[in-house]
């Protein structure tokens, strides 16, 4: 699987459509990271460009804060698992995701 975290600095970005950076991590069938995580700086905030990047990269799971219903429906229609309303640092969220294999909506890392 390939997960994409929508970031703002070290934290999950509060809004999908305002993100300017993402982190892509590959996970094998045993739940272990494979390869090096890849951080991509986006040229500017754009939900449409972010959706295009997600599809181009073959992402299977998206972890984000808030996301507009239209973008959520589009990504799920394309077969992606979208875990939204997540709050925490990228590091905490990845650790929690790897331990559990998923995140419940509205998960808050403290």
Where are these regions (language model features)?
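Conserved SAM-binding loop
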Residues: 63-64
């Amino acid at each position: 699987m390939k997960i994409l975290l929508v970031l703002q600095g070290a934290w999950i970005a509060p809004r999908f459509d305002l993100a300017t950076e993402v982190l892509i991590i590959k996970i094998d069938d045993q739940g272990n990271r494979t390869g090096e995580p890849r951080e991509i700086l986006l040229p500017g905030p754009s939900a449409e460009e972010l959706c295009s990047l997600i599809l181009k990269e073959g992402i299977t799971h998206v972890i984000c804060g808030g996301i507009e219903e239209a973008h959520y429906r589009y990504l799920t229609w394309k077969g992606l698992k979208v875990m939204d309303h997540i709050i925490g640092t990228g590091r905490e969220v990845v650790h929690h995701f790897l331990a559990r294999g998923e995140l419940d909506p509205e998960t808050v890392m403290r």
